[in-house]
Amino acid sequence: ELLLTVPNLPNENVPLGKSSEDNVVEVQRGEIPQLQESAKPHWDICAEYDIVDFELGNKITGAGFPVYKRKGAKLQRALINFFLDEAEANGFTEVQPPLMVNENSAMATGQLPDKEGQMYSIPLDGYYMIPTAEVPVTNIFRDTIQKEKDLPLQYCAYSQCFRREAGSYGKDVRGLNRLHQFDKVEIVCIDTPEHSYEQLEKMKNHVAGLLEKLELPYRILRLCGGDMSFTSAITYDFEVWSAAQQRWLEVSSVSNFETYQSNRMKLRYKNSEGKTVLAHTLNGSALALPRIVAALL
């Protein structure tokens, strides 16, 4: 049990640092638009055109659970289909996973015990609402031995994601900036240690391609050790520019976990020498919808 509380070791290419201020901007693409002073933030546009109703969601459930209406709902559906179609075109197999997982699954991908207080739980049944499709999709391969010739395994999934986001407040969480329930398309890859970093680059290129097709200015950051997740060996964040808010919004994280998750979930493959070894797991958001919609509006 003590070993489950030990985080992953950072890759040698991870910058030293304690916070987001120490992250390294690797690339920035797209022209930053200049709006007039009368430009409205997305939450005002949503209210004016009645396409996302935050007050109604607050009435039904609480803050952070918006109701998408009319063209807002259609835009959500269109973006989800676009992201899934692009993933399939790039070799990812679509699956539709459960939105709840058991404790073993959450332990296997490292959400537990690290994110215990951040996940919505259903104690009566011993289930957790998923914070990302990474959890159920990666667990498809828990307790399996794959054949090397079948690697890489590439999967994509659309799901709603649920996060408590305890302690979040202020203008940075207004509107669609930070929600408790949101839509996201996730890409997951299982590969050999020899090829996993090639896959990482392909996944980064896939995410960049989506943002370029949406014509959104974006930048890629290599996260420092202090800003990475508990489970990651290396992570790249993608941020888009919100012209109305005049700031960058994170819309994707692409990570290589190396053998951290596979060791917890006993995900192995038989190599060319006949030896059974741990695989590398990778995943990325491709993409998370709320902030994409915020930037588009």
Task: Indicate residue ranges for each PLM-predicted region.
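N-terminal alpha-helical targeting/anchoring segments
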Residues: 1-33, 47, 51, 55
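TRNA-recognition modules of translation machinery and tRNA-sensing kinases, especially anticodon-binding
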Residues: 28-297
